[in-house]
Design a protein with these regions (language model features):
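A cross-family phosphate/adenosyl-ligand binding-site feature
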Residues: 35, 41-174, 182-245
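Generic detector of bulky aromatic hydrophobic side chains
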Residues: 17, 25, 110-114
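Alpha-helical protein-protein interaction elements
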Residues: 16-18, 27, 53, 232
């Protein structure tokens, strides 16, 4: 009985030596991911977008993005989800404290916001948690380092990170507006991981070459660029035409 047992182990080990699964390093993985084409998002009308808000500073960016999406005739529907820290951020930076969370879209946009639907972050069974739901893309603005890490690790512990994970697995546009500085090695590696998985890492870095007059100009121009990444270019976005030496 004992001899037969060792004979079986020897045979198993022999098979393992014959069948070896190659391990891919980061460079090889990036190359393979680059070969997988992501379906284009842009279409004439009826675009559905998910907007996520986390606790990183930059609530004004989220507000501007939502206002633009709400007013864009090409956008049919917007799903809004905010983490607990994201809700605290909105209260701290914008003074938005809804007594009813469903009123959050209208409080942020200053309109009826009929095309924006608020989804609780704890509702892991919401439509956007499934790849079968029709969603054309997602932006997390601002995106905290914590949310970035969760997405990079694929843990998806709440609706916000699950919706982002769905975009990656379905090869849909995912824009992460990271708001963190300085960056440590873990942040940089997580940025590389989500990039290689198909996301667009778009740190919240405003531009100054168009001579903005006020902070709102900086915020709005950045929001224009965010929407461009989602296939929704805006006519008012400043376009650099070259400078003089």
């Amino acid at each position: 009985m004992r001899a037969g047992h060792f004979g079986w182990r020897a045979a198993r080990n022999a098979v393992r030596r014959e069948v070896q699964v190659p391990r891919l390093d980061f460079a090889e993985t990036r190359h393979l991911n680059s070969l997988v084409q992501r379906p284009p998002m842009a279409k004439s009308s009826g675009i559905i977008v998910t907007v996520g808000i986390t606790g990183a500073s930059g609530a004004g960016y989220a507000q501007s993005v939502l206002r633009l999406l709400d007013g864009d005739p090409r956008v049919q529907r917007v799903f809004l989800v905010a983490s607990e820290a994201g809700m605290r951020l909105l209260a701290t930076e914008l003074g938005v404290v809804p007594t009813d969370a469903k009123k959050l879209p209208s409080l942020l946009t200053g309109t009826a916001a009929k095309k924006i639907e608020y989804l609780p972050n704890k509702d892991i069974g919401a439509s956007i948690a499934s790849g079968s739901a029709i969603v054309d893309g997602m932006v997390i603005v601002p995106c905290s380092a914590g949310a970035l890490g969760s997405i990079a690790a694929g843990t998806a512990g709440d609706l916000l990170t699950r919706a982002a994970d769905v975009c990656l697995k379905e090869r849909r546009p995912l824009v992460l507006c990271l708001r963190e500085t300085p960056l440590n090695r873990i942040h940089l590696e997580n940025m590389l991981r989500v990039h290689d998985a198909g996301a667009t890492v778009m740190p919240a870095m405003p531009a100054f070459y168009y001579a903005p007059k006020k902070i709102d100009d900086l915020i709005e121009q950045f929001a224009f660029r965010v929407l461009a990444q989602l296939g929704l270019p805006q006519e008012k976005q400043y376009r650099w035409k070259g400078g003089k030496e």
